[in-house]
Amino acid sequence: MTNEESGKGWTVADIPSQVGRRALITGANSGIGYYAAAELAHNGAHVLLACRDKAKGDAALARMRAKDPRAKAEVVLLDLASLESVRAFAAAELALGVPLDLLINNAGVMAPKKRLETADGFEIQFGTNVLGHFALTAMLLPALERAAANYSQRPRVVTLASIAHKSGQLNFDDLQSVKSYSPMGAYRQSKLADLMFAFELDRRLRAAGTPVSGVMSVAAHPGVANTNLFQVGEFNPIEKMVRKGFGVAIGTLLNTEEQGAMPTLFAAMASGATDGGYYGPQGFQEMRGGDVGPAAVAPQALDRRAAARLWRECESLTGVSLL
């Protein structure tokens, strides 16, 4: 197996030219999303920085262009916690009539202390991390199909999961955490759902035939990266003790944002990434590490019956059909 196929030794220097490709990244104003967007633009892609806050998006774009004046990027407004916003954005994007080569479902909400709701009344983590991205992917599929009909590099949907999925469970009787809310429990459920979505999307794309079968579904996780999500989330007692015990030094135990972005970049651009693949850092417990490789998958993420049920739930809750 070559380095390109395994991810071992793969770096940003191995990214193929992205000239002519159009990429959309949600949550691109900071953290992993920003670094993935910057690398895509640096390698020639036209990047859409999908942000819910225009000021933060503009600041990210200015930062990107200060580092690389040639970067082709623009800020687009998208709030995944509002299906109305998702519909409006997707309608405007499809009206352009241009292909979309890459969709990175990166934005996320992590473990708010109190149960919060989206504009549509969903628990905010499930509503944003899962339902918002499900609806966005469904609505943008025609643009991805356009790219699939005539591609040099196959169009891809990359969905960000997490090592937290390993301890996640889908509670179909209370997906919105109305009866009982645990900040990290709801987060783990959302990340398990994201990974199951990526796998089920892969199966359905390949079963659909051309041109849609030309679209790849890939997943990635950043390990434990020192991003805004990690800094503001509510953690379980063990995680709290670790943070308190290590204090500032905990930063040395985590992936930087740049390191955390590597699995996403591999999933999005490496020729060695495969249909239905799931990639993460290869250090201790996949929490950190420079090399990228296939990530461990919890048994519950491979439950096809549960994945099909989750799919139906997502279609019902969003009012959007997908494959």
Residue positions per predicted region:
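Rossmann-fold NAD(P)H-dependent dehydrogenase/reductase core
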Residues: 2-239, 317-323
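C-terminal helical subdomain
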Residues: 190, 244-295, 302-308, 312
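Short coil/turn segments at secondary-structure junctions
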Residues: 120, 124, 181-185, 248-251, ...
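Pocket-edge positions in alpha/beta enzyme catalytic cores
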Residues: 49, 78, 252, 299-302
